[in-house]
Amino acid sequence: MSIEYSANKTILVAPLNWGLGHATRCIPIIKALQENKYIPIIASDGVALALLRKEFPYIETLELPSYHIEYAKNGKNFKWKLIKNLPKMITAILDEKKMVKSLIKKHGIDGIISDNRLGVFSRKIPSVFMTHQLNVMTGNTTWFTSKCHQHIIKKYTECWVPDTNEAVNLTGDLGHLKTDELNLKYIGPLSRMRKKDTPKVYDLMVILSGPEPQRTYLDEKLQEEVKRFDGKVVFVKGVVEKTQTKEEIGNVTYYNFMNSKQLEQTFNESELVLCRSGYTTVMDLAKLGKKAFFIPTPGQYEQEYLAIKLQDENLVPYATQNDFTIEDLSKVKSFKGFAQFKNNIDWDSLFSIFEDKA
């Protein structure tokens, strides 16, 4: 079915600034909006906004209030640090709500796609919430946090889940509910990557992401560990700065960050990937059919859950940040790695939500 698109509707795309994952998985959506004659406006804050400004220099961008998401120095205190920051987060969400209301009028916005930004919503225009976490893992408070999240999702016109609703899926309990009370659309895994047949240049690709201070802790640890790696290494620190830097030390080539095109090329040129087990990274690796090793962010239950799930399925091994040594990479040989998936998203059907006449 092909939709007759109304002339150039404006869609606000607003990813959460929590590491780079939410921003990067919005890239294929923003491109699809442009290809389907919509006008996207990007709204976020911090490194997520910086990354999307580099990716789409000609698209209008707006800065939203920061949620003040900080990681505890010790992973065990992660949940309590979040609880301590809750008042700041709630204030930011309320400010965001007010701001979105005025942005809709000022920019003539016709629809919303919010990737986990809880204040980006309007009852007056079609509003989509995108998340892979219908259940929010927080240890012994998982039931409570999941119910709160589902309550928020319920008010949106539709909820897009970047996974399949098949028996074989990537998110497991994170992205699947036992009840059918939310207006869910499983859109399939989202990735900006394409698999290419290119000669292998690197034996190991290290790619870091995620909020501070845990990104820095892992960065420092792995810079020491890769000195003992026998082979060529490319090391992407995941620090988005004004200009890209490249430094070669021994067998390791360091970059502060890469844009999508460079990342795609480097992924394809690398034999093995060492990274966090964030869901956006999982989708990219699955799209490319890569072999990988995971180090979940300490205290982030979602990443720990995904790492355990994928190891149990004999796809990807993992180690904790404290325990990891470079010798652990030898375990990868006995794991299957990701089978490459092809996901042809039906953008016509997805974007029809913005075309429904009231």
Positions of predicted regions on the chain:
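Conserved nucleotide-sugar phosphate-binding/catalytic loop shared by glycosyltransferases and other
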Residues: 7-10, 17, 35-36, 40-86, ...
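A short, glycine/small-residue-rich beta-strand->loop->alpha-helix junction that serves as a flexible
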Residues: 15-27, 213-216
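Short amphipathic alpha-helix
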Residues: 23-33, 48
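Donor-nucleotide binding loops and adjacent catalytic segments primarily
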Residues: 30, 188-272, 282, 304, ...
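Conserved nucleotide-sugar donor-binding subdomain of glycosyltransferases
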Residues: 77-119
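Leloir-type glycosyltransferase catalytic cores
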Residues: 84-88, 315-358
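A nucleotide-sugar donor-handling region in carbohydrate enzymes
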Residues: 131, 136-213, 237-241
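Catalytic binding pocket for nucleotide-activated donors in carbohydrate/polymer assembly enzymes
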Residues: 281-282, 286-328
